[in-house]
Each structure stands twice: as structure tokens, then as C-alpha cells.
Design a protein with these regions (language model features):
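Long, compositionally biased tandem-repeat segments
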Residues: 1-384
Length: 384
């Protein structure tokens, strides 16, 4: 096996993992020192062996210092799995300057050329609190299943955005990364979830599911991030099924709005299409909307994916999100999100047969209490 890389001193990157020779695993990358990147994982053996795991990025140290990026996972040779990417480091908090950004997650390594799964992408680091919030790091791309047989790696999740203690805006949350493509035979990897938005901040969108190549199902899309006092983020699209056989992946659900009187639920991701034989993926559900002074709307559901050209049903549309409950006098509840459209039927099938079902609309939010001003007349008072 290749040797492991050393950890970096403060502010210094971690060392790369050593490659294997003919048979053996690649070494792991070393962790980055404060605010520095992690080292890359070593390459797996050319005949057999897994790629090494990437090192984690170092957390920021000192007011407003960003976290380091995660190291990339090492690729496999002929037979073996790719190494996972390292996680990004968290940013450092601050008072009179902006909080530090979270580091990016490292990409997963590719699977073996004959057999092996791709490595998972690392997760993004969390943005820090400051006068302006730090941005959350994006997740790392999932590694591809490159060979005859292998599943794509899952995409990394986005990091949470940092909150703010002053007029500048909160930090934007990190995006979920796309899942890796499947090998000649194998499923696509799932997309990563988007990061949660800080209060009033932009939430991260979900990553797309990876596509299958010849035989296999598309990966599911990642969920959109939740937020408060701002919109929920959209879910990621499902990956396409294999060119010969396989279902499309389901779309990720939209992010919810958990508090506040602004913002609507995120849209559900669209389902992936089947190509020749297989069913389309279901659309993701729209995000729900929590209570507000005036009820806001739930998110729309995603459309279903198309059925295969030779055989397969279209995917069902995703249901709409729940509308928000209104509070206070005379306020109106939010509207439920629209359901997604069903996916298309195969072109040769009889009209209407094989199409996906449309998603149901989301429930409407409840209304606020009736006004008590001016006070109502007593029931015993005669009315002229």
C-alpha cells in the first residue's frame, strides 16, 4: 500500500497519500492545517486496490478565516473502488468582519476500469457567523463508476450558510454535488443535499443524480436545503436510466421554509427519464411552508420523467408542498404547491396508456383569527 500523507502544520496543506504499485491500496491524504487544504488520496494499484481517501480541510482559525478544501479521493486502477473525497473545513466566526467561508468538499475518485464503484464526494464546510455570514462550501462531485461494472459515488452535501449579526446578508449555503455516473453496468450515484440557509440566507440546491450508462438506474436527486425567512431551495433532478435498461432516478424534494413571514417552499426536482426500457423517475415533492403573519405558498412538485422508448411508464409527478398557516387577524393561509405533471408514455403505446400520474396539489394553509376590532354587536341588541 501507499503511505499516508502527513498532516499539515497551521496554515499548511496536508500531504498527498502515496500511490500503490501493482497490487495494493493508495494511501490516505493528510489533513490540512488551520485553513489549509487536505491532501489528495493516492492512486490504487494498477491491477488491484482501492484509491486512498482525501484528507479533510482544516478549520479556519482567526476571525473570518475560511476553512480549507477537502482533498480529492484517489482513483482505482483496474479493479477497486475510488477513494472518498475529504470534507471541507468550517470557517471561523468573527465579530467586526465577515465570517469565514466553509471549504469545498473533495471529489470522489473514479472506480476501477474493469470493476469498482466511484468514491463519494466530501461534504462542504459550514460558513461562519460574522458581521456578514460566510458562505457554506459546496459538496464534492461523486466519482464515476468508470469500468465494466460499478456504481457512481454519491455527491457530497453542501455546507450550511453562516448567520449575520449586522446589516450585511447572511452567507449563502453550499450546493449539493452531482452523483457520479454509473459504469457500463451500474447505477448512477445519488446527488448530495443542499445546505441549510441561515436566517434570511439563500439555501443550497440539491445535486443532480448521476446517469446510468448502459444497464442501471439513474441516481436520485438530492434534497434542496431548508431555510427560514427566505425561500427553500429546489431539489436536484434524478439521473437518466441506462441506454439499454433502467429506470430514471427520482427527483429530490424541495426545501421547506421553517419560520418567518417571507419565502416559499422550494420546487421538487424533476424525475429522470428512462431511455429504452424502464420507467421514468418520480418528481420530487415541493417544500412545505411553515406559519407566517401572512400565509405563504408551498413549493410546486417536480414533473415525472418520461418512460422508455420501447417499454415503461412515465414517472408520477411530485405532490405540491403544504401552504403556510396564517397568524393574526384576518390573514390568509398560503396556497398549496401545484402537483407535478406525470411523465410521458412510450410513443408507440395507445394514447393515454403508460403516462405518469400528476401529483396532488398541496394543502392550503389555515387562515388567521378573525379581527375583534371593532367589537361585534351583542346579539340581544335590536337592529333597526
Amino acid at each position: 500500500n501507499g503511505g499516508n500523507g502527513g498532516s499539515g502544520a497551521a496554515g499548511q496543506a496536508g500531504g498527498a497519500g502515496g500511490p500503490a504499485g501493482l497490487i495494493g491500496h493508495g494511501g490516505s491524504g493528510g489533513a490540512g492545517g488551520s485553513g489549509a487544504a487536505g491532501g489528495a488520496g493516492g492512486h490504487g494499484g494498477w491491477l488491484w486496490g482501492n484509491g486512498g481517501v482525501g484528507g479533510s480541510g482544516g478549520a479556519g482559525v482567526g476571525a473570518g478565516v475560511a476553512g480549507g478544501h477537502g482533498g480529492a479521493g484517489g482513483a482505482a486502477g483496474l479493479w477497486g473502488a475510488g477513494g472518498g473525497g475529504g470534507n471541507g473545513g468550517n470557517g471561523a466566526d468573527a465579530n467586526i468582519v465577515s465570517g469565514g467561508d466553509g471549504g469545498l468538499g473533495g471529489a470522489g475518485g473514479g472506480g476501477g476500469w474493469l470493476y469498482g464503484d466511484g468514491g463519494a464526494g466530501g461534504h462542504g464546510g459550514q460558513g461562519a457567523i460574522g458581521l456578514g455570514g460566510g458562505a457554506g462550501g459546496d459538496g464534492g462531485q461523486g466519482g464515476a463508476g468508470r469500468g465494466l461494472w460499478g456504481t457512481g459515488g454519491a455527491g457530497g452535501h453542501g455546507g450550511q450558510g453562516g448567520g449575520t449579526g449586522g446589516p450585511p446578508l447572511p452567507g449563502q449555503a453550499g450546493m449539493g454535488a452531482a452523483g457520479g455516473a454509473g459504469g457500463l453496468i451500474g447505477n448512477g450515484g445519488a446527488g448530495g443535499d443542499g445546505g441549510v440557509g441561515a436566517s434570511g440566507g439563500v439555501a443550497g440546491v440539491g445535486g443532480a443524480g448521476g446517469n446510468a450508462m448502459l444497464i442501471g438506474h439513474g441516481g436520485a436527486g438530492g434534497a434542496g436545503g431548508d431555510s427560514s425567512f427566505a425561500n427553500g431551495a429546489a431539489g436536484g433532478a434524478g439521473g437518466a436510466g441506462g441506454h439499454l435498461f433502467g429506470n430514471g432516478g427520482s427527483g429530490g424534494h424541495g426545501g421547506a421554509v421553517t419560520a418567518g413571514n417571507t419565502g416559499i417552499g422550494g420546487a421538487g426536482g424533476v424525475g429522470g427519464d428512462a431511455r429504452l426500457i424502464g420507467h421514468g423517475g418520480a418528481g420530487g415533492a415541493g417544500g412545505d411552508r411553515a406559519g407566517a403573519l401572512v400565509g405563504r405558498d408551498g413549493g410546486p412538485g417536480g414533473n415525472g420523467g418520461a418512460g422508455g422508448q420501447l417499454y415503461g411508464n412515465g414517472g408520477d409527478g411530485g405532490p405540491g408542498g403544504q401552504g403556510g398557516q396564517a397568524f393574526g387577524a384576518n390573514n390568509i393561509g398560503g396556497t398549496g404547491g401545484a402537483g407535478g405533471n406525470g411523465g410521458a408514455r412510450p410513443p408507440w403505446r395507445e394514447r393515454g396508456e403508460g403516462g405518469g400520474r400528476g401529483g396532488g396539489g398541496g394543502g392550503g394553509g389555515g387562515g388567521g383569527s378573525f379581527s375583534t376590532f371593532p367589537p361585534p354587536r351583542p346579539s340581544s341588541t335590536p337592529v333597526a
